[in-house]
Amino acid sequence: MIGLINGQVQYLMAPTACVMTTSGVGYDIELPLPSFCQLRLNEQASIWTHFHVREDAQLLYGFIDRKERDVFRQLIKINGVGAKMALAMLSAMSAAELKMHVEQDSEDALTRIPGIGKKTAQRLLIELKDKLKNIEVDSSHLEFAMQPAPISAEGSIIAEVEGALISLGYKEREAQQAIKAAKSNGETFADTQSLLKATLQQFQSFK
């Protein structure tokens, strides 16, 4: 089983990154958006991974923080929560935020995540209480770090962010509305990561 990959980031297309190790092997890894936003093209990265096997594919999911991977593994143990939904949950909020919402029985916070309705949220709150209570996540920073990244054309940035959100389960209209709201104050975004961060924050104000 592949548990940790160290290498140079060769390619970034949210939510997938390709990381090449010193042996010359490149691994395509899907990451929750907060982890994805910490990667930089052509820079070194250490990514904790979960190897996921389906009938039609073998996939690697990656996380900057090992505890985030622990939370992901607990999520996919729950009946009805697949890897895609777990990735969407950890894209909509950090592992620390998820644990906080579970401890506070915050049903509304979970229903903001694409694919999670009221009944599913209620069931998740019950099942996650025991699963997450022994996982110590870093709650000192609920906002993920952002650094300047190479400039891309604005149209490409918007298209990439929209595609990333849709791949995680958001509807096209929801993704477009969130992007529009993020840009409503006239701010310009020079890179995908900064627009992703601003767009994800908009979902917190929806519903």
Swiss-Prot record:
Alphabetical list of NCBIfam families matching this protein: ruvA (TIGR00084)
Quaternary state and interactors: Homotetramer. Forms an RuvA(8)-RuvB(12)-Holliday junction (HJ) complex. HJ DNA is sandwiched between 2 RuvA tetramers; dsDNA enters through RuvA and exits via RuvB. An RuvB hexamer assembles on each DNA strand where it exits the tetramer. Each RuvB hexamer is contacted by two RuvA subunits (via domain III) on 2 adjacent RuvB subunits; this complex drives branch migration. In the full resolvosome a probable DNA-RuvA(4)-RuvB(12)-RuvC(2) complex forms which resolves the HJ.
Sequence segments annotated as region (Domain III): 153-207
SUPFAM superfamilies: DNA helicase RuvA subunit, C-terminal domain, Nucleic acid-binding proteins, RuvA domain 2-like
Gene Ontology terms for molecular function: ATP binding; four-way junction DNA binding; four-way junction helicase activity
Region (Flexible linker): 144-152
Domain of life: Bacteria
Protein role: The RuvA-RuvB-RuvC complex processes Holliday junction (HJ) DNA during genetic recombination and DNA repair, while the RuvA-RuvB complex plays an important role in the rescue of blocked DNA replication forks via replication fork reversal (RFR). RuvA specifically binds to HJ cruciform DNA, conferring on it an open structure. The RuvB hexamer acts as an ATP-dependent pump, pulling dsDNA into and through the RuvAB complex. HJ branch migration allows RuvC to scan DNA until it finds its consensus sequence, where it cleaves and resolves the cruciform DNA.
Segments of this protein annotated with the region Domain I: 1-64
Annotated InterPro entries: DNA_helicase_Holl-junc_RuvA_I, Hlx-hairpin-Hlx_DNA-bd_motif, NA-bd_OB-fold, RuvA, RuvA_2-like, RuvA_C, RuvA_C_sf
Locations listed in the record: Cytoplasm
GO cellular component entries: cytoplasm; Holliday junction helicase complex; Holliday junction resolvase complex
UniProt keyword terms in alphabetical order: Cytoplasm, DNA damage, DNA recombination, DNA repair, DNA-binding
Comment text on domains: Has three domains with a flexible linker between the domains II and III and assumes an 'L' shape. Domain III is highly mobile and contacts RuvB.
Region named Domain II: 65-143
GO BP: any one term: DNA recombination
Family classification: Belongs to the RuvA family.
Protein name in the entry: Holliday junction branch migration complex subunit RuvA
CDD domains the record matches: UBA_RuvA_C
